[in-house]
Design a protein with these regions (language model features):
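Short, Lys/Arg-enriched segments at the junction into DNA-binding effector domains
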Residues: 10, 120-150
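Charged docking surfaces used in two-component/phosphorelay signaling
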Residues: 22-30
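Acidic, metal-coordinating helix/loop segments flanking the phosphotransfer/catalytic sites
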Residues: 37-54
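Acidic catalytic/metal-coordinating carboxylates
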Residues: 39-40, 65-68, 92
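Short amphipathic alpha-helix used as the core "switch/output" element in two-component signaling
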Residues: 46, 67-78
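Active-site residues of response regulator receiver
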Residues: 58, 85
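Receiver (REC) domain active-site loop signature in two-component systems and cognate sites
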Residues: 61
Length: 150
């Protein structure tokens, strides 16, 4: 089930392993997420739009690898990205995070851990969107003073 107060979130799952994407998509759908699949980085960039709340991204893929895909996503979007990859060495994890990934989960992984991490990322992203700054003008002798209130 998706967590209370959260509408069904749309996830873009990007991996060239068809069997894995089929399995993961089914697990995520049963958990309450809407899932769209792309099998390489270029396909992901073509499909990515504002309706996606999260991208799950492999690194080792044909056409456009996950690192290059992440760089291109970060040029135009702040959508949360979680790397899901067999490249689990410390240098790979650090590089992914430094390039803008929000989380990094090496394969193989536990389905429950994946879903828990997804929910945590979406919860943080939702909380950030709710922080709306109110601008309150105050007039004082023909000058306007602005107070920004969080």
């Amino acid at each position: 089930m998706y967590y209370k107060g959260m509408k069904m979130s749309k996830i873009l799952l990007v991996d060239d392993d068809i069997e894995l994407t089929d399995l993961l998509a089914e697990v995520l759908r049963l958990t309450g997420f809407e899932v769209e699949v792309a099998n390489n980085g270029q396909e992901a960039l073509d499909k990515l739009n504002e309706s996606h709340q999260l991208v799950l991204l492999d690194i080792m893929m044909p056409v456009l690898n996950g690192i290059e895909t992440l760089k291109k996503i970060r040029q135009t979007s702040n959508v949360p990205v979680m790397m899901l990859t067999a490249r689990g060495e410390e240098i790979d994890r650090v590089l992914g995070l430094e390039l803008g990934a929000d989380d990094y989960l090496p394969k193989p992984f536990n389905d429950r851990e994946l879903v828990a991490r997804i929910k945590a990322i979406l919860r943080r992203a939702t909380q950030q969107k709710k922080k709306i700054y109110k601008i309150q003008p105050h007039f004082h002798q023909k000058k306007i003073h602005w107070n920004f209130v969080a």
